Regions:
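Short, conserved beta-strand edge motifs with alternating hydrophobic and charged residues
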Residues: 48-50, 99-102
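Arginine/glycine-rich "motif VI" loop of SF2 helicases in the C-terminal RecA-like domain
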Residues: 39, 133-135, 161-163
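Helix-biased detector of long, well-ordered alpha-helical tracts
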Residues: 17, 86, 102-110, 193
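Short, electropositive alpha-helical surface patch
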Residues: 152-165
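C-terminal helix-cap and adjacent tail motif
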Residues: 3-13, 86, 165-196
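Short coil/turn connectors at secondary-structure junctions
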Residues: 94-97, 137, 162-166
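Small-aliphatic-rich amphipathic alpha-helix that forms the alpha element of a beta-alpha
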Residues: 33-34, 99, 105-154
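N-terminal amphipathic, basic helical "cap/leader" segment at the start of enzyme domains
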Residues: 1-94, 196
């Protein structure tokens, strides 16, 4: 699969086969993520990969608990989308692997005040997602674990150092056979581009 095919094929997957991804493939995903550009080549990120059933099930419970926090937003959605999200948040959509992306806190540093390292992290995540697509995997970027109590519990579960902070998480897995992604309308090019 070439790059353009991977870009066009990539979408959020919210239903997965209950199949473990081999560690070798996960390492390849992180290797590809680490090739992304970052300001001053700092690569201020660390990937915590939850790939064991026991810890995965604990993480699934954490995500399910965020449904209560999002109740108002979910109730505003149309019925089919509401059903998809409730199922997704109830069991990670069946995904067996969750990758948590952390960064090292850099206190009293100008870089900490500006989003340079966040841009680098985002580039790394996109590399990871495109790499996953090229290997027949699906991904879904989720930020719901940033709720303070859940983040604290996650840090304890994964033995995260105090000088690291959670940025986001990505589910990775084999898309469920017959899965049809939600069709999300993208902005028209004229809305996001301006030639000067």
């Amino acid at each position: 699969m070439n790059l353009q095919e991977a870009i066009n094929k990539r979408h959020s997957v919210r239903e997965y086969e209950r199949k473990i991804i081999p560690k070798k493939i996960l390492i390849e995903l992180i290797k590809d993520a680490s090739k992304a550009p970052s300001a001053k080549n700092e690569q201020n990120y660390k990937f915590y990969i939850v790939n064991s059933k026991k810890k995965r099930d604990i993480v699934a419970k954490y995500l399910k608990s965020t449904l209560k926090l999002m109740n108002k937003q979910i109730n505003k959605l149309e019925e089919n989308l509401k059903k998809v999200l409730i199922n997704f948040y109830s069991d990670l959509g069946g995904a067996q692997t969750i990758i948590f992306v952390y960064r090292k806190k850099i206190k009293n540093s100008p870089e900490y005040q500006f989003p340079n390292d966040l841009a680098g992290i985002s580039c790394a995540i996109e590399n990871l997602m495109l790499s996953a697509v090229s290997r027949g995997l699906g991904t879904c970027w989720i930020g719901s674990f940033k709720e303070p109590k859940i983040e604290k519990d996650l840090n304890k579960l994964m033995n995260v150092k105090e000088d690291e902070e959670l940025i986001t998480s990505i589910l990775v897995g084999y898309p469920k056979k017959g899965y049809k992604p939600l069709i999300r309308k993208k902005k028209k090019l004229k809305e996001i581009i301006k030639f000067i």
